[in-house]
């Protein structure tokens, strides 16, 4: 096999393994690593790789497959050794039912950051045959989005998570009141009426406020009168170490008054627990053995440990992981809501957002998130998820079973002139999936009038080179006329023609593809797409993968997934 044939085979291999598109750099790397003798002439290798990559990328998937088979099949090459999968072991799992919880605040639908917590808990539940609890933490009326009560269970269901038990904290206020009173009775908590600014000065100087020395009886009297006070007039504090090195840990607030109507409770209550109090009480009563949370909760874990010890309760194992970011995507719920309110975003499933429903609408599979989250694990180092990684994993999942169709973006209608009589009424049969003939075929009729992509039309016009309509004929553009040029693929390749998709004018269906930046690409799709159903995944040849979002009588709307 000569040098050109060798590089050609590697280019075909790279294309077939990566969505039918190869990259010059990848091909050169494969060639050099497997054929050390070629390192002596890198210039020639580089020039040939550039030419052959362009040739391969101009072939249809079927043509790539046929070409590589004619050369003896895919080139074998060394792949990077895969890292072993699996989460680290949890401590202290012996002789107990491992119990975990996913506890989101209902400030909006879930995003990828929430998915990390949900999936980690799910994976550990499965690993230890444990129990998983969903707990909606809605004890701050100012941070509750009513729609989230329905959205969170829906998002959890899409992730494939079925909690063993579900709780909503606003149903449990009387329980928190009971334990607040118990904390007072054992001397672990006190009612504080100090001005917030004054208390901070004392706290920062490791000095107790005057309220800390109240007797239990004095604290109970204030507690019993708490409901008659105004917001900010008093709080219930948990005693910690007033000399603690972190001022945030010192005598933290457990209960406060919130003068805001609660979406579920109305104005029935005005005394609400702070997160650290309600979470500790619930985690104990619900039998939590392990708590997985972000490292931004390190101080909260320490605060909660004081309350565990006050009550003589077992402290669960706390596992803290790093922050999760996503390239070019808004994960802040508050910023997303602001964008929705000012019409920057179309809703919680706007493709520019990192919400679960936005990702799902684009056709990203939940298995991708599981793979990513398991790989990142519980490391305390911050992690960034790239779209490139998501797309690669998703492509591996969907490619095998995704049918192919011709979509013509920004379509130009052309009438091919000078057709031989044998080409005036033809039917082209194409496989729905070139690797799975058992899936069947689609038929495209040709009578001279077709839609082709505007970009390809302009390219042929500017470069004065023909275009090949896939599996059909070659055409050329002379001024504003489209003329029959020749018939064979070899003729097209000899003239460096682009091989393009097309659709019959008479039978095509209007189609719109919503892109990741929320722009809309309009065009036409072949008539066999009328058999599609909502949520079907397709590969629009030479355009990308997409999910069927909506089907009307004469139009299909897709959401673009990736290339």
From Swiss-Prot:
Compositionally biased tracts (Basic and acidic residues): 76-94
Record-linked CDD domains: GluRS_non_core
Documented EC number(s): 6.1.1.17
Disordered: annotated span: 61-94
GO biological process: amide biosynthetic process; glutamyl-tRNA aminoacylation
Motif 'HIGH' region, chain ranges: 104-114
One Pfam family of this chain: tRNA-synt_1c
Zinc-finger among keywords: no
One MF term in the entry's GO annotations: glutamate-tRNA ligase activity
Catalytic reaction(s) noted: tRNA(Glu) + L-glutamate + ATP = L-glutamyl-tRNA(Glu) + AMP + diphosphate
NCBIfam families: gltX_arch, PRK04156.1
Entry similarity comment: Belongs to the class-I aminoacyl-tRNA synthetase family. Glutamate--tRNA ligase type 2 subfamily.
Protein name: Glutamate--tRNA ligase
